[in-house]
Amino acid sequence: MTLTFQAVQVANGHDEEGRLVFAEGRLIGVLVQLSGLHEEQGVAGQWFLETGYGRGLSGEHPTFPDLSAAEEWIRQRLER
């Protein structure tokens, strides 16, 4: 399965760096890099699944230390 990540700017006021996630050309999720406002929670700079679409991703909102970890988690979910 081919996953692609497209860089985008997200207009939510603070966590602006984002990635659209596509599987075989279909949008399956939106990842947002958490800003310094999340330092107290210990997740600043990590990637957050803002929204996911389809089986295994809908309703999930985990954080990941980097995009590689996010990709691995998404692949595992899609292969279920």
Question: Where do the language-model regions lie?
Answer:
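Intrinsically disordered, low-complexity regions of eukaryotic proteins
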Residues: 17-19, 52, 62
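Short aromatic-glycine-(Arg/Gly/Cys) micro-motifs in beta-strand/loop hairpins
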Residues: 31-59, 76-77
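Intrinsically disordered/low-complexity terminal segments and short unstructured peptides
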Residues: 1-3, 50, 62
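A generic structural signal for ordered secondary structure
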Residues: 27, 60-62
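A short, charged, amphipathic alpha-helix used as a generic interaction element across diverse proteins
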Residues: 53-54, 63-80
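Negatively charged, low-complexity tracts enriched in Asp/Glu with abundant Ser/Thr
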Residues: 1-26
